[in-house]
Amino acid sequence: DNPEKMARMRDWLEIAAREVDVDPSVLTDVEQPLLDMVSVISHGPSRPGAPLTAFLVGIATAQGGDTLQLVKKLMQAAEQRGQTRD
């Protein structure tokens, strides 16, 4: 992606994380996999479902799930679902 857009995204996410009392560094290792997942879902099974899927990953992670494994599982499910788009 465009480096300027990515810098703005990171600036925003730092603000957002602080607003909800989350250490912004939690995104370091999962940023690109989450962005990839959202892209696959938004261009595949459901555009409006993409951000909500990311929310579900966050909830599952908070319940003890492994973020990267969850992302991988959901990307596989989205790819199996095909290219039908809402």
Located regions from the model:
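Short alpha-helical scaffold segments that flank and stabilize functional sites
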Residues: 19-20, 57, 61, 81
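Residue-level detector of functional hotspots within protein domains
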Residues: 6-8, 20, 38, 45
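Generic N-terminal targeting/processing segments that precede catalytic cores or assembly contacts
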Residues: 1-3, 18, 22-24, 29
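C-terminal binding/interaction regions
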Residues: 1-17, 65-86
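Amphipathic, hydrophobic secondary-structure cores in small proteins
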Residues: 25-27, 31-62
